[in-house]
């Protein structure tokens, strides 16, 4: 007999049913899973062990660095940071704190005048001072870098006291006024004592007697002496009188010349001083107006 289509049908394989071998394999896998997990926990992979060792080393380094910084800061001053400020790059913000409360909490003395001037200080500034003092603790000159408000206050007070002190009186003889005075050299020679220093009209001083008016002296009447009585004694006395009269005339002329040149210089100096005083009065008037405006606006000084 021939089949339809002229082909042969493939043989049908028998389906494997749930036999006893497959069930035994599944039970073996489920039983070996706890053993594998236990081995992994006892002997972790190499990468996990390296990460744990690195974390432990980093933690030990941080602890040793913190202990060293605390030891350095303890050598300079008592520890003042009991709490650390977290810093993650975004949530860090500068905050202001009360300096008085901060000093009282940490037992640090401070000058009241300095506290009155600087009541609030930023935390970053205080932290910067602490880090600078701890980093420079090894050299002996680091103690001079610590801020000492008491010394600065005393120095400012001493400078203010020096400014308030009245200046010492000035000798009027040492004061020189710029005066365009150029006397004739011949007049200076005539006003100088022969054989002495050249007369200086700027610094020369006269005695009170020299500045007093001189009385007019009447000349004595001439007495006629005949030639028979003009003996040697007469001529000696007459020569002495002539020399004395010449000396008195020369001294009087010298004094008159000195007074004349000195008076000319004083007149020019007086004119220069008057102009200077006028300028000073203008400046003082301006200062007075400024002070009066300030007092009317803000009250008396």
From Swiss-Prot:
The keyword Transcription regulation applies. Residues 1-70, 130-174 are annotated as: Disordered. Keywords: Activator, Biological rhythms, DNA-binding, Nucleus, Phosphoprotein, Transcription, Transcription regulation. Residues 131-158 have a biased composition (Low complexity). The keyword Transit peptide does not apply. Residues 233-253 are annotated as: Basic motif. Residues 231-294 form the bZIP domain. GO terms for molecular function: DNA-binding transcription activator activity, RNA polymerase II-specific; DNA-binding transcription factor activity, RNA polymerase II-specific; double-stranded DNA binding; identical protein binding; protein-containing complex binding; RNA polymerase II cis-regulatory region sequence-specific DNA binding; sequence-specific DNA binding; sequence-specific double-stranded DNA binding. Coiled coil: none annotated. Residues 39-59 have a biased composition (Basic and acidic residues). GO terms for cellular component: nucleus. It is found in: Nucleus. One of its GO terms (biological process) is positive regulation of transcription by RNA polymerase II. Pfam families: bZIP_2. InterPro entries: bZIP, bZIP_sf, PAR_bZIP. Residues 254-261 are annotated as: Leucine-zipper. Changing residue 219 to A: 30-fold decrease in affinity for prolactin recognition element. The modification Phosphoserine is found at residue 30. Induction: Accumulates according to a robust circadian rhythm. Expressed exclusively in the rostral portion of the anterior pituitary during embryogenesis. Found in several tissues in juvenile and adult rats. Belongs to the bZIP family. PAR subfamily. Transcription factor that binds to and transactivates the TSHB promoter. Binds to a minimal DNA-binding sequence 5'-[TC][AG][AG]TTA[TC][AG]-3'. Binds DNA as a homodimer or a heterodimer. Can form a heterodimer with DBP. This is Thyrotroph embryonic factor. It comes from Rattus norvegicus.
